[in-house]
């Protein structure tokens, strides 16, 4: 098995066996559920109370720059958008021929089903791109839109994205568990 296939399989096993099955049946109510006050989420345009919001469609993402300390609790909707745009979307566009996306130009999903469709498509493109990398590709820093955007070798970037998806996916699963047991 090539290195790129091992890297892709590390995340794909987690995706198939743990994360993606846990997202089945996600409802819109869960997607937007705010477990505490002042959560960041995806909201209809013009309704955000966050310092900033971005998005090109009817729905926008709450955020601030710089990030507040402590960071607000986020909804499943926000976490999925973060994975779709920040973790995967930028890099799919930069390195694997996908569309260019950023916080301000992305059309955020207004339903759980739409978000899961976006996630599935972006994940599949990322994973296929990783599987297609050669050992030479993995050893050198990727050529992104801005020099130094990802300053470590591509292999390090892939490992970082694997960690990010496992980490943020676990947060989403915890929010689902809390939702099920709410009062």
Specify the residue positions occupied by each region the protein language model found.
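Short, contiguous alpha-helical
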Residues: 2-105, 143-183
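Acidic/histidine-rich alpha-helical segments that form the ligand environment
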Residues: 106-139, 156-166
């Amino acid at each position: 098995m090539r290195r790129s296939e091992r890297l892709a399989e590390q995340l794909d096993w987690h995706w198939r066996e743990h994360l993606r099955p846990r997202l089945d049946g996600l409802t819109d109510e869960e997607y937007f559920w705010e477990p505490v006050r002042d959560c960041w989420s995806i909201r209809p345009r013009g309704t955000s109370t966050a310092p900033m919001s971005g998005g090109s469609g009817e729905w926008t993402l709450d955020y601030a720059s710089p990030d507040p300390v402590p960071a607000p609790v986020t909804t499943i909707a926000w976490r999925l958008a973060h994975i779709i745009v920040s973790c995967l979307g930028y890099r799919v566009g930069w390195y694997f021929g996908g569309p260019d996306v950023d916080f301000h130009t992305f059309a955020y999903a207004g339903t759980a089903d739409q978000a899961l469709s976006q996630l599935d498509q972006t994940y599949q493109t990322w994973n296929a791109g990783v599987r297609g990398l050669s050992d030479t590709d993995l050893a050198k820093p990727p050529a992104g839109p801005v020099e130094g955007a990802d300053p470590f070798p591509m292999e390090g970037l892939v490992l970082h994205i694997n960690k990010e998806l496992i980490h943020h996916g676990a947060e989403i699963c915890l929010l689902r568990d809390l939702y099920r047991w709410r009062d």
